[in-house]
Amino acid sequence: MKLQLVAVGTKMPDWVQTGFLDYIKRFPKDMPFELTEVPAGKRGKNADIRRILEREGELMLAAVGKGNRIVTLDIPGKPWDTPALAGQLERWKQDGRDVSLLIGGPEGLAPTCKGAAEQSWSLSPLTLPHPLVRVLVAESLYRAWSITANHPYHRE
């Protein structure tokens, strides 16, 4: 199974790149984790946010692999603690499909992305900065994998 993070935004600070890469390089060969970035729409004083969201959603869904399970990262999603996420990871592996996790831009996800999702995951009831979410998702999934693989990274 391959994990794909599809995220709005292409210019992340160095600390985001460093943190994200630190975790994704730890994943085993049979579970590669890749990042696909889509450009954020130009936002300004008179920007049509609905159209920007719509376009970002089109780009995100076009980046998702055919047949992939789509999981959105969204505040109203299900809050999974670490053991629950490990269980989700196991179920995704048993399903046999690749998984695409979608992170929206500053205004969130397009309705088309939410509609295409089979699941929605809430990292926190807090509004988190989108760059930070990339690192949190990578670490959380690595920790979940470590539980399923009996790797010593996660400690109770």
Curated annotation (Swiss-Prot):
<feature type="binding site">
    <location>
        <position position="104"/>
    </location>
    <ligand>
        <name>S-adenosyl-L-methionine</name>
    </ligand>
</feature>
<keyword id="KW-0949">S-adenosyl-L-methionine</keyword>
<keyword id="KW-0698">rRNA processing</keyword>
<dbReference type="InterPro" id="IPR003742">
    <property type="entry name" value="RlmH-like"/>
</dbReference>
<dbReference type="GO" id="GO:0070038">
    <property type="term" value="F:rRNA (pseudouridine-N3-)-methyltransferase activity"/>
</dbReference>
<dbReference type="InterPro" id="IPR029026">
    <property type="entry name" value="tRNA_m1G_MTases_N"/>
</dbReference>
<dbReference type="GO" id="GO:0005737">
    <property type="term" value="C:cytoplasm"/>
</dbReference>
<protein>
    <recommendedName>
        <fullName>Ribosomal RNA large subunit methyltransferase H</fullName>
        <ecNumber>2.1.1.177</ecNumber>
    </recommendedName>
</protein>
<dbReference type="Pfam" id="PF02590">
    <property type="entry name" value="SPOUT_MTase"/>
</dbReference>
<keyword id="KW-0489">Methyltransferase</keyword>
<dbReference type="InterPro" id="IPR029028">
    <property type="entry name" value="Alpha/beta_knot_MTases"/>
</dbReference>
<comment type="similarity">
    <text>Belongs to the RNA methyltransferase RlmH family.</text>
</comment>
<keyword id="KW-0963">Cytoplasm</keyword>
<comment type="function">
    <text>Specifically methylates the pseudouridine at position 1915 (m3Psi1915) in 23S rRNA.</text>
</comment>
<feature type="binding site">
    <location>
        <begin position="123"/>
        <end position="128"/>
    </location>
    <ligand>
        <name>S-adenosyl-L-methionine</name>
    </ligand>
</feature>
<comment type="subunit">
    <text>Homodimer.</text>
</comment>
<feature type="binding site">
    <location>
        <position position="73"/>
    </location>
    <ligand>
        <name>S-adenosyl-L-methionine</name>
    </ligand>
</feature>
<keyword id="KW-0808">Transferase</keyword>
